[in-house]
Amino acid sequence: MAHQEYFVVVYNNGTKFWFQNGKLHRLDGPAVEYANGDKLWYQNNKRHRLDGPAIEYADGGKHWYIDGVKLSIDILMALS
């Protein structure tokens, strides 16, 4: 795999955003990590994750997205 270069914005409270070519994007982890523990995966500015939920809230809530499209529980159950 080619080396990935990111522009990372880190706020004083610890919140972090990863960008590539001006878009939220990260291949090796969440592109957004909020100080409260929430994590959001993005590729090319779209919520996207194939190996788990694209949104993981610190309180345990989770949402699955592929290429920016939210997957319903029915689709998730059919895929498992």
PLM region spans:
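Glycine/tyrosine- and acidic-biased, solvent-exposed loop/turn segments at the edges of beta-strands
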Residues: 1-80
